[in-house]
Design a protein with these regions (language model features):
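Conserved beta-strand termini and adjacent loop/short-helix elements that scaffold enzyme active sites
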Residues: 7, 82-84, 118
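Non-heme Fe(II)/2-oxoglutarate
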Residues: 1-73
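Conserved short histidine dyad/triad with adjacent acidic residue
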Residues: 80-98
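Catalytic core of Fe(II)/2-oxoglutarate
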Residues: 106-163
Length: 163
C-alpha cells in the first residue's frame, strides 16, 4: 500500500542538471500566495514552485523518461518537478482532489525528511528521502511537505501523474 522503491530512477544527477538549467531560465511557476497557480486546500495555502512538463525542453523530458520502467512510461500523462526552498511547504491534501487516478513521487534530493503522510488509521509517518527513490501511495492518501528550515538546501521531487 505504502512503499518506498529505491533506485526507481538512476539518472538523478542528469535530471537535476537539466532542472537547474530550467530554474536559471525562470521556468518554475510560483505556487504560493500571489503566484500564478496557487495550491490551497481546506487546511490553507502552500508555498513552493513547480516546473511543469509544458515548460520543459525535450532534452529534460527525454532524460526523465530514460530510466523510468517501460510499463510506467506508456501511461504517465504528466510530469512535474516541485521545488521547496527554505520557508516553503506543501499543505496537507489528497491527490485524488486533483482529478487524476495515480501519483508517484520520486525524490531528486535527500536530507532531513519532510514528506509526511497519514495512513488509513490516521497515523502520521515521515518518509526518509533518498535520491532516485520512489514513494508509492494510494491516491486518496492525505500528505504534506513540512516547512523547509532556513539552514536546509532546497528539495526537489519529481511527480509522475496519471490522469
Amino acid at each position: 500500500m505504502y512503499e518506498v522503491v529505491n533506485d526507481y530512477i538512476t539518472n538523478v544527477d542528469d535530471i537535476m542538471q537539466k532542472v537547474l538549467e530550467h530554474e536559471a531560465q525562470g521556468k518554475f511557476t510560483n505556487r504560493g500566495i500571489g503566484g500564478t497557480d496557487t495550491h490551497a486546500t481546506i487546511y490553507g495555502e502552500s508555498h513552493f514552485s513547480s516546473l511543469y512538463e509544458k515548460d520543459m525542453n525535450e532534452d529534460l523530458v527525454e532524460t526523465v523518461w530514460e530510466t523510468l520502467p517501460e510499463s510506467e512510461r506508456k501511461w504517465v500523462s504528466q510530469i512535474v518537478v516541485n521545488k521547496y526552498k527554505p520557508g516553503d511547504w506543501l499543505v496537507k491534501h489528497q491527490d485524488s482532489a486533483g482529478g487524476y487516478w495515480q501519483f508517484k513521487l520520486v525524490f531528486l534530493t535527500e536530507g532531513k525528511p519532510h514528506f509526511k503522510y497519514w495512513d488509513k488509521d490516521d497515523t502520521e509517518h515521515l518518509v526518509q528521502e533518498k535520491k532516485g527513490a520512489m514513494f508509492k501511495m494510494p491516491i486518496e492518501t492525505w500528505h504534506e511537505v513540512t516547512k523547509i528550515e532556513k539552514d536546509e538546501d532546497p528539495k526537489y521531487s519529481l511527480c509522475l501523474i496519471w490522469e
